[in-house]
Amino acid sequence: MKFNEMTYTRPDIDALLARCRELGAKAAAAPDGDALVRLYYEQSEAFAEYNTAANLANIHYTCDTRDAYWKAEQDFFDANGPAVTNASVEISRAFLANPHVDALTEKFGTTCVAGMKNAVLSMDDRTVELQQQFNALVSRYQQIYGGALVELDGKQLTIPQLGPYKEDLDPAVRRAAYEAEAGYFDAHRAELDELYGQIVQNLNAQARVMGYHDYSELSYVRMNRIGYGPEEIRKFRDQVANDVVPQLQKVMALRAKRTGIAHPAFTDLPILFRDGNPKPIPGYKARMDAARTMYHKLSPETAEFIDFMQDNELFDVESRPGKMSGGYMTSLPSYKAPFIFANWNDTSGDVDVLTHECGHAFEGYVAERDPAIPADLECPGMESAEIHSMAMEFLTAPWHHLLFGRDTDKYALLHAEDSFVFLAYGCEVDEFQHIMYQNPDLTPDERNAEWLKLEKKYRPWIDFDNLPFYGRGAGWQRQLHIYECPFYYIDYCLSTMAALQFFLLSLTDHKDAWERYLRLVRRAGTASYTELLETAGLKVPFEEGSIKGIAQQMTDWLENHQV
């Protein structure tokens, strides 16, 4: 079924909550493990209609944040979502209270019961009103960001549409693009500062109600991180600071030599090549045709997937006024259909987001068609889900010439370099958030000062050159995740460590790398992050010394593939 044929009906919340109470009672009273397993499948399916409606509403709202109807529907789910989540948690509580609960682990693997325990530990009826307030704060941030229009080159442009100007070979054009963006954020400075302060206070209040010191503790439970915690993440960040950042300084020196910009400022960093960055082929249809060919050549599984996605028009990837920034994949369970949202801006990032979100969507497509995997276990934790997307960016490389033509080698270098350099920024975002939630009374200026300290730690090569907004340490405010989903961002780093290993493997044996990837994908959400890495034969980045060799291999490859 094509996306525009999918019908939306606002769900009956009272009926859903009653169904949840019924399922909870059945789970508590299930007489044996077999009955409990059947009920687990049943409760997973019970939320399909609600989740489909919620995701349809969110798709339509983010495609046009100015549409009053979809804004009202989004408000409905913002208001009612916490009650539905809490009802789901009560079902989990009933499963956990049943003496036969170990049958779920035997049937579905380690993440099923561990995930329910995290769900119970992360939710509380006393936080429902706070959750509703948080949802409203996030929606307001999305309105500010999604409604951004700036004047440049005689045009009214959205933030994503500034992308090509930021990559222009003329430094004055690049500077003007960044200043236009900065002007918008500076104009909304007071509200953005206030919103973030309210978000920190709100989430910390939720954490304290539930017995946690602050939200940095609760977030690990809510993110359903299984088998590791803040200490492992701190060790990971330390390895990045000690073993990756020194290598990145070499990489940035190579970039400066390659571009001829001896002392690059922040506005010069998007320039990776003297004659300009790689450009994908123009035109929506041409790109979609190339993507179809690429996925047909990659594997039979991806061929079936891309045909389903394109034939059913499950992409909205072109930028336009009123459309929310960013990109995502979401699922429409009732139709067993993934959906991909993006904002193309005629830069190489268009291919990044296409292959990235197709990685998410491919995993969802595979999991939804495996009858043994309950809906609740179709997707793993986010640090694992991002492996699907980031590794897909690399594993499609043999066919990137279909999208880049003569710029293919440039894109290969840009993509590998950007992915490697990203590790530092991702760790910076994560450490910043730990500081913010552990020190909630910091003033806006103090928050920005902390960000600038972390810039020196993780990205010492950056020179803001008195750039408005960024130069005062407020650049973090344009990072959607910091407002919308705190502590999510480190997941990209953990998955990048897996993706870089897939990349290095694919250089010597692409078939083996793909088969490892497919094994990982097929486990869906039934295994933890470390278990999934072990399934694919990859190193776990929490272990001391696990990153150093990978960092050296990446630096060597980049040095040997300068264009």
Residue ranges of predicted features:
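A well-structured
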Residues: 1-278
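C-terminal, non-catalytic "cap/extension" segments appended to globular domains
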Residues: 115-117, 227, 354, 362, ...
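Glycine- and acidic
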Residues: 122-123, 179-188, 228-234, 269-280, ...
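Long, well-ordered alpha-helical segments
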Residues: 196-213, 251-255, 359-369, 390-407
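Inter-helical turn/loop segments and adjacent helix faces that build the functional surface
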Residues: 230-231, 254, 258, 298-301, ...
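Post-HExxH zinc-binding segment in Zn-dependent metallohydrolases
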Residues: 242-243, 367-368, 379-407, 415-416, ...
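Auxiliary, metal-adjacent structural segments of Zn-dependent hydrolase domains
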Residues: 275-334, 347-348
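Active-site recognition of the HExxH zinc-binding catalytic motif
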Residues: 342-368, 389-390, 394, 432, ...
